Amino acid sequence: MDAFVRLKDARFGEPVVPDEYTFAAVVSAAAALPAMHSGMPLHAEVVKAGLETSVFVGNTLINMYFTNGESGSARILFDSLPEKDVIMWTEMVAGHSSSGEAELALKYFISMLQEGYKVDSFSLSSALNSTAEFAGLKQGEMLHAQVVKSGYEGNICASGSLLDMYAKNGALQGAHLVFYTIPKRDLKCWNSMIGGYGNYGNSEMAFKLFGEMIRDELQPDHVTYISLLSACSHCGLVEKGKFYWFCMMTDGIMPGFKHYTSMVSLLGRAGLLEEAVDLLQKSPFAKKCPELWRILLSSCVALNDLSVGIHAAEQALAQDPDDMSTHVLLSNLYAAAGKWDVVAEIRKKIRGMMVEKEPGLSWIEIKSTIHVFSADDECHSQIDDCRGELLRLKGNMELLYSSENELLSSG
C-alpha cells in the first residue's frame, strides 16, 4: 500500500498513472485488510482511473470483498461488469460457498453453466460443498453427473467434496461408492466417511474405517475425533467414548467445543451427571459457552435430576439470561419434580420473553424454489393456497376417520 501511495504521488514531469496490473496487485495485497480501510478506497481509485470495467481488476476486487465478508458488494460489482470470464464466475461460486451462502453459490454455478463456461474441479468442489451444507441431495446428484461429464472422477478435490456431500446428506451408499473409487484418499476423505457413518448411527462402520485409516498410516486430527466422539454419543457407547478421548489427548490434540459437546451429551445421557459436570467445569468453555450447560440440563430433565439440573441452568443463564430454551428446559425440570408454583413463575417469564422476541424463520425447498415463512405469517404470497390445501387435507383425514369408524362398527 505504501509503495502504491508513493507511486501515485511521484512526480517526474508527468504523474505516474497506475495501470490495471498495478491495481490488481495492490488490491490482492490489501485483501487481508478491512475493506473499509483499504479495499473500498482502492475501488474508488480504480473508478477514478477509468478501469472499473477491467475483468482483471474486477476479479481481484471481488476476491477482496469476499475475503472481507462483503458478499453483497461482490455481487453488485459482478453485476455491473459488462464482461466476465471463467475466473470471475468461479470466484462467485467459491466466494458464496465459503461465506455460507449455499443457495447463491449454486445459483451462480448453474448460471455459469448456462453461460457456456467450462467448469473446473475447484468450481465443482465449491458447488458440492454448498449442497453438503444445504442438505440438497438432489442438486448434489446432478453435480455428480457434472463431475463425471467433466472428467473429474479421479480428481481428489472434486471427489472429496462429492464424498462429503453424500456423507452429510446421509446417502451413505453413495458416499461408500465414491470413497472406494478415489485412488489416493487423503485425511479429509477419511474424515467425511467416518463422520457420515458416525452421524447417522452406524458406529461400527465408523470405528472400522478409523482402524483402516490408522493401518494406512494417516494421523487423525481434531475432525477425526469429533466424528468418533459423535458416533459414541449417538450410540451411547460410554467406554468407547472415553477411550477415544484418551487417544485424542495422547495424540496431543486439545479438545475443542465440539469434542466437549459430544462428551457432555454422552455422559449426561448415560446418567453420569457428576462426571459430566466435572468434565465441563474443567473445560475452557465452562464460563463462555452456555450451550454445553444446556446439553447437561437436557439430560437432567430426562433423568429427573433436580439438583444438577438447577446448577446447569444457573450456569447457562448466568451467561445468557434471555435464552428461552434454557427457561423452557428449567420449567420442564420443575414440572417433572411437581413444583408447579415455580413452573408457573417460569412460564410467565417465558410468555413475556415471547412478546419481545423476533419470530424465527423456517424454510422449505419445493421444486428447486426456497419458500421462507414464520409462525402466524399473513404476508406470504401463497397464504390462501396454503390454507386451502390444509382444509383439503383436513377434510380427507376426517373422511378417512369416519370411514374407519364405520368399518369398526360394522365389524
Model-inferred region functions:
Residues 1-411:
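Terminal (and in a subset, N-terminal) low-complexity or junction segments at the ends
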